[in-house]
Amino acid sequence: MDLPPLSLDQLSAVITAGPTPTDLYTSLSAYEEQACLLSATDPSEKDLLLEFYTAFFFSHLLTDQICEARALTRRIPREISRLDAMQTCSLLLRAVWQSKHTEIYKILRELPWPGRSQPLVQRYESYFQEKTLVEMSNSYETIRIAAAATYLGLDPAAVEGDIIEKFTACGWKWDSEKQLLHPKPVVTAPPKDDSLQNELSRVMALISNQGS
Amino acid sequence: MSDFLAYLTSAPSRPHGSANITDKCYDHQLRDLIAYLKQPGVAPSTADINGYLEAISPAVHSLSYLYLLRIRIQQLQEKTAVGVPNDLQPGGTLWNQTVKFLRSFDPIQIRYVGHEWRELVDSVANAALSVSKPILAVKMIRDALERLNTAGVFTSLHLMLVKLALLSSSYTYVLPVLDKLLCHFPSDTQNAHAGILLCSEHEPSTVFFTDSSGFSANLTYRDHLQFYMYSGMVYMALKKWDQASHCLGIVISAPTANSVSKIMVEAYKKWVLANLLGHGKLFSVPNLVAPHVTRVYQSLSKPYISLAEAFEKRDFQRLRTEISLGQTIWRADKNSGLVYQVFEAYDKFLIIKLGKTFSALTMPDVLQRASSCSKGSRDIEEFVVSLVMTKELRAKLSHSPGNETTTMLRFPLSSQSHALREEHIRFRLIQKEAALNTISRAITQTKITLETSHENLQVIAKNQKLAGSSERSGVVGSTEADGGGDLDEDLMGDGR
């Protein structure tokens, strides 16, 4: 099926449709070819390219494709990659790669982002918080409240009770005597991986063919 | 014009009108169509071709559509005297029609015109390269290869695809092709299965990819090595070290006569780095590599071996010196980026190694024990925490109570909780069960193919007994002894 032409409205429609991260990535990657055919020096197309590449960049982060996001920053036209928003994307990518939580929240919340990408910026912040919460739950046996708050980008100066409530709502326990939170490990099934089955089928087919 | 259109649409694809035709009849139809289209003077004028391209569907009449596209490209090339006419450049009309075709063609019809199909794919790659946008060809060629389904046969297009992926820095796009096992070269036409119809849907696809089918240019030893070398580089760019090591291992294990090729030596250097970055150690070369070849690798890659030795001995000063001394070598070999990552990997494996000696350490202890770590006291906790949180280090962290700001790093026997462990065991059991089912099904199929199933063997034994008793009783040439009995026919019915 032919894709509708890439335009600011179409891009907004794709972003606001709220697809799963994988679907968002798939939809936007289908538009990369159209984006390649636009001129980065034409002022009317420059905005569209900036919005597209920012959204595409976030779709990589939302699907945890950090290495490919780095590759994307290399194939963005130079005229676009020099723009402030793309420079901010690079800063964010470096902070994500280095696991600098405080910096990540600061970049997401305080630096300017193109208008149409705002929903994705907020979506990534929520995604990153959820991911970090799972990582903390499985990595820490006990954690100080300030540290836990920093990982989630919460204000450590906020009312302690509110922060504690946020974590206890996730099944964590609060030890008021020791002033420590006890995370509850999150059990997740490993991702389904068909590669072993596929390889086995191919090897067995090969043996069968060679034998006959 | 209507006669010509009638010819063009005379053999629709199987799901669109030819489903009830026998293979033999469909084969005739397609061969007749090709013979007609190849007749001299049958090519329509430019204006007509555009009309026909609009009139027919590339998915239903793939053979005819491909023929028209090729004629149009040739006409434009002759008219403009350039390899990539404007119309064929990305965004042009012909480009768009080619994209439409490569994303929807019928793989059965295309089996008859492999050469022409490959030429069209080559044109797409050249067109994308002519405007310095190789990425435009990457997804299209990947989709075309997936659609064609080469079933594990290596072709020159695989090499072209991986080269374009490296040129365009678009690595993930080609993984669906690189992740598949390639275990055949196009088969020798002489040995190709005779009497098999190209339109048959029940034969293994490998039968159709022969050295004369045209789907691949002539392949050389170098092409094979280059493909795996470039595939290794794609995986390294994505930090998939195991897959990278596997691909590079294929290159360094390639059979050699007298000399070792440069590409094999380059692959060895990258293989050393991939193993350092992925596993923190220098592996022995695969058993397939002859000792004299290993010696050649080692003598031509001395800086890399020294680097790996310093890494393995956890000698940070020496490692830093080796990296500094070899800068011109890393740059010349285009391995600077990989060598730069060695510092980070060194720190990681240093911390991981602590878990083999200690069961718990405070962060100041970690810094003291890993004194050669390139991280300072400020960064070490952040680094260790990120290793634990990303599951690269199997350990648990715990903060001390009260006002102490110490963080304890514990290396439990299992870093997983009971529930998590159970979930993983359950998952692995399911995985093993599926693997056993796959093997079991394949064994049954192989037995049928090789006629060694239990029932077959019983019938053979029975036949031999009968033949023996017939001979003894003087009756020769009975039906059962020839294997022509009812039971035999019934059993062998599906086995062929």
Swiss-Prot record, chain A:
PROSITE patterns for this protein: PCI
Location of this chain's protein in the cell: Cytoplasm; Nucleus
Predominant subcellular localization, coarse grouping: cytoplasm
InterPro entries assigned to the protein according to its UniProt record, in alphabetical order: COP9_CSN8, CSN8_PSD8_EIF3K, PCI_dom
Stored Pfam families: CSN8_PSD8_EIF3K
Keywords associated with the record: Cytoplasm, Nucleus, Signalosome
PCI domain span: 26-193
Name of the protein described by the UniProt record: COP9 signalosome complex subunit 8
Swiss-Prot record, chain B:
Composition skew (Acidic residues), residue ranges: 483-496
Localisation: Cytoplasm; Nucleus
GO CC, one annotated term: cytoplasm
Coiled-coil region: none
Subunit structure: Component of the COP9 signalosome (CSN) complex.
Family: Belongs to the CSN3 family.
Name of the protein in its database record: COP9 signalosome complex subunit 3
